[in-house]
């Protein structure tokens, strides 16, 4: 019997399913790694073939990044004298517009090379393949270091980010894609670099000449595409009688004409459903920008927040009515009114559906409003989400605020949404629904929310998410970086009553602290005290700056130059 028991004990050790599973997983990971290396090697060979002159200058070692519009490789410059120099090679996709490529290069050459803005060393081209050579900055992953940064390191990080933003904003450059992966950080050397100007736009007074040209080309292209669909009021006298057909149709529709704001006049919906502009300074300089709102037009969109959106024409009758009404309305609006900003939103003479949860056939027949929407989900400002046509450098400051929010809360990504309406609802859970609605009115947008959501106290929110109360630090798995994978807004947000999902301390599995584990606890206490020094005494100035960065009104949002002078950075050298 003892021998029998011995066999039963040995069998699980010799043929352990758990061990077999670990071996299988290890083998699978090894195969995936080999497959990845083979793919990288193939990509490097293709790059050498596409741009042969690279082989004379660089030895490409690895592929270190890949995005929608480019791939980045690590290379060593083969210099005849001096030490080897590491170079980052950015290979732009062949379908990139030549003007866009030239504009990105001009941003790097004019504004880059100082104040934490990446510069450029060389540029190579062969046919439609362009490679930009930039200094290589070895950097850490934001996610890996997020929960080990000391409070002083966070101050230094934000200070250097604002230096970079001040630099590019002085040249009239709107980066449009400010996020941790585009702000490289070498923790050991304390070096920083703002990179990737592929989506950059120019302000109205930009000093980057090619950004002006990009805007002009983009606007002319949209105007030419919609020229055949535009009906002006020049041939219809203002005091003339209303056409009989229009008069008869208007009696069948119980709708009152709504005066057009600047945004409503300029943006229409074409017959083919494409976005277009009637013409007048609608900025959209990004070629090939991705549409991050592909889910927003689906019928199961969130009922919590409803924008006054424009959709395709639903029937021929409403299209005729809208077309003839536009012919008269366009004549009424003179050039002075056309130049008004989107903040002038008339309160009178609106149609029946205005500021309600319904959209009338007249509004459905209008062309969709065109506005710049390029950027990364989770970092886009409210004015971008609501398609405000007049966007400024303030959108970069909002993105910086989201980064600061992640640093203070220990959560990344903080916002995670599949479409614009969900993203707006998540912003409301932090900043408040009433505040969001009021701010939207300042740039001519009407937002409806089914339930009022109060604004959160930023200090309480960040301390709760980091696992600390206002007085004593509490140890949670956030310290080991486990909670950084959880967005502050859950993916399962209830859109009928959007709310913040919080995880109480001690409910994480895996690496959570346990009372009986004295060795690991002692080690983590030491690491906690070393790396998280200062987190139990976060000053009010930090949350005041965060509040100003996340100002829902872009007109009053703090600028990079003002942020550098904020008391949060006192006693720090600029």
Swiss-Prot record:
**Keyword ATP-binding applies:** yes
What Gene3D superfamilies is this protein classified in? Phosphorylase Kinase, domain 1, Transferase(Phosphotransferase) domain 1
Q: Which residues carry this modification: Phosphothreonine?
A: 503
**Example GO biological process:** double-strand break repair via break-induced replication
Q: Which reaction does it catalyse?
A: L-seryl-[protein] + ATP = O-phospho-L-seryl-[protein] + ADP + H(+); L-threonyl-[protein] + ATP = O-phospho-L-threonyl-[protein] + ADP + H(+)
**Residues noted as binding ATP in the record, renumbered to the chain:** 64-72, 90
One GO cellular component this record assigns the protein to is:
cytoplasm
Entry-annotated residues carrying Phosphoserine: 27
One GO MF term on file is:
kinase activity
Q: Which residues form the active site?
A: 177 (proton acceptor)
Which superkingdom heads the taxonomic lineage of this protein's source? Eukaryota
Which PANTHER family did the record assign? CDC7 KINASE, ISOFORM A-RELATED, OVARIAN-SPECIFIC SERINE/THREONINE-PROTEIN KINASE LOK-RELATED
**Function per UniProt:** Kinase involved in initiation of DNA replication. Phosphorylates critical substrates that regulate the G1/S phase transition and initiation of DNA replication, such as MCM proteins and CLASPIN.
Indicate what this protein is called per its UniProt record. Cell division cycle 7-related protein kinase
Q: Which species?
A: Homo sapiens (Human)
Its gene name is CDC7
């Amino acid at each position: 019997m003892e021998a029998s028991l011995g066999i039963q004990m040995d069998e699980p050790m010799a043929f352990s399913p758990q061990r077999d599973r670990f071996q299988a997983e290890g083998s699978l990971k090894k195969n995936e790694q080999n497959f990845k290396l083979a793919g990288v090697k193939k990509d490097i060979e293709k790059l050498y073939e596409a741009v042969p002159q690279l082989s004379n200058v660089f030895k490409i070692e690895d592929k270190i990044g890949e995005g929608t519009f480019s791939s980045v490789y690590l290379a060593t410059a083969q210099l005849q004298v001096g030490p080897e120099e590491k170079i980052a090679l950015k290979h732009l996709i062949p379908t990139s517009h030549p003007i866009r490529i030239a504009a990105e290069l001009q941003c790097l050459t004019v504004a880059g090379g100082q104040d934490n803005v990446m510069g450029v060393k060389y540029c190579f081209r062969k046919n439609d393949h362009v490679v930009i050579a930039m200094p290589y900055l070895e950097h850490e992953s934001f996610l890996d270091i997020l929960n080990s940064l000391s409070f002083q390191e966070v101050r230094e990080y934000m200070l250097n980010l604002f230096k970079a933003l001040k630099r590019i904003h002085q040249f009239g450059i709107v980066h449009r894609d400010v996020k941790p992966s585009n702000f490289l950080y070498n923790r050991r050397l304390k070096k920083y670099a703002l990179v990737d100007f592929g989506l950059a736009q120019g302000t109205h007074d930009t000093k980057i000449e090619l950004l002006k040209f990009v805007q002009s080309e983009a606007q002319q292209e949209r105007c030419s595409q919609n020229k055949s669909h535009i009906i002006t009021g020049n041939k219809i006298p203002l005091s003339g009688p209303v056409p009989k057909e229009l008069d008869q149709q208007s009696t069948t529709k119980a709708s009152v004409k709504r005066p057009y704001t600047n945004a409503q006049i300029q943006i229409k919906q074409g017959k083919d459903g494409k976005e277009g502009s009637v013409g007048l300074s609608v900025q959209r300089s990004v070629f090939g920008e991705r549409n991050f709102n592909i889910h927003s037009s689906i019928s199961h969109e969130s009922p919590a927040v409803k924008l006054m959106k424009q959709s395709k024409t639903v029937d021929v009758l409403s299209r005729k009515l809208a077309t003839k009404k536009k012919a008269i309305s366009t004549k009424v609006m003179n050039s002075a009114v056309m130049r008004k900003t989107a903040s002038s939103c008339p309160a009178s003479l609106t149609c029946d559906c205005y500021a309600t949860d319904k959209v009338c056939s007249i509004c459905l027949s209008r062309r969709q409003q065109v506005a710049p929407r390029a950027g990364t989900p989770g970092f886009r400002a409210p004015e971008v989400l609501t398609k405000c046509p007049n966007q400024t450098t303030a959108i970069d400051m909002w993105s910086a605020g989201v980064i600061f929010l992640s640093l203070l809360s220990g959560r990344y990504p903080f916002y995670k949404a599949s479409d614009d309406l969900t993203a707006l609802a998540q912003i409301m859970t932090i900043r408040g629904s009433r505040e969001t609605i009021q701010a939207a009115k300042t740039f001519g947008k009407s937002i409806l929310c089914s339930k009022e959501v109060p604004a959160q106290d930023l200090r309480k929110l960040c301390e709760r998410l980091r696992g600390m109360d206002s007085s004593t630090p509490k140890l949670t798995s956030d310290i080991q970086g486990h909670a950084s994978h959880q967005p502050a807004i859950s993916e399962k947000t209830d859109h009928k009553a959007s709310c913040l999902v919080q995880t109480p301390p001690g409910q994480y599995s895996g690496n959570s602290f346990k009372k009986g584990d004295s060795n690991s606890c002692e080690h983590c206490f030491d690491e906690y005290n070393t790396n998280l020094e200062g987190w139990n005494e976060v000053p009010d100035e930090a949350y005041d700056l965060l509040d100003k960065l996340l100002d829902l009104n872009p007109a009053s949002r703090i600028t990079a130059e003002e942020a550098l002078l904020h008391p949060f950075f006192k006693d720090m050298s600029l």
